[in-house]
């Protein structure tokens, strides 16, 4: 389906579409972004860094992308990395090389994006080790994301635009590295080696570093079709997520505007990507978590191990109050429900439809969510039960071909969220996607 020219009633359409994760990440955003990139002129990243990850298959070849948007795999597509990102340039160059072709000719990097150095990764590891000893581990990817955003917020970070003038970059680099080595008592760090690498990056990237704000708005005025790719997901947002067990950037719709420099009236449509069950990596509250055989079944059948870290993901039942909270923040217009096939084989499927206070019995107010760890401990899930199905659904091409119990589960989710579920993932391959044409919103 061409997202820029869809025929769904009561849903806006236009030239700017954002695809955002609606849970704790790992929803399977890569597949839908890959499918929709075919219809876009420009694909963008606006937040995060190499702590995100997609594995995309094109013409039977797999590509692991952590910094580049999925549109890089299409020769007619321009790719943009926005100012809200933190970019480990060595990792970026390795990704560019792995994709091959004349990718650099259609890649644009914001001059306001911040550079993530190896020392940020060292600091990340130091901080996480210290927190582990204190029993306060966050469970970061140790990719240096938090420390880089920290230097940005402290106003001592270095932007990509600085790399265009290498002498100026060298001076700023030395001051930053010396400051961080002193602050974190780092005694050994090969500055000369890193500077030599950055001189090569300066030569290769100086013409690709641009004012992305001007670039984006000029292209929007020329009616270019833009697909915006969110990294991580809503419940990892630095403000709205389960703080402090979150990432360091704005992962919700507000990050689109602050991370690309386009204004809110330009965004026409938001697609929320929702896994048919729930997972999270690392620490933090998880009210529907399954520490049992069912949780292990979902982990193994769904291959729930981190793309970036390879860590096993925690698994649990789908959480409607969470999705209603995320919908409030992001104004989600459509949903892509992923990995429905993983639920095949379960005798019973539970859907969390509310939370009840353990002491008072009071139900959670619609649109609210207990993101604080101490508050989340006061609540317990209220479940609606559904019968499972045994059939292999990976060969289903239409909604009506799904088992009755699978259809009931999908329609219940749609009813609670009052948002059309347009795409349903029924298998790992690109073709394993049902496009649903009728919706249950009453």
UniProtKB/Swiss-Prot annotation:
GO terms for cellular component: cytoplasm. The keyword Cytoplasm applies. Substrate binds at residues 307-313. Its main location: cytoplasm. Pathway: Purine metabolism; AMP biosynthesis via de novo pathway; AMP from IMP: step 1/2. SUPFAM superfamilies: P-loop containing nucleoside triphosphate hydrolases. PANTHER family: ADENYLOSUCCINATE SYNTHETASE. This is Adenylosuccinate synthetase.
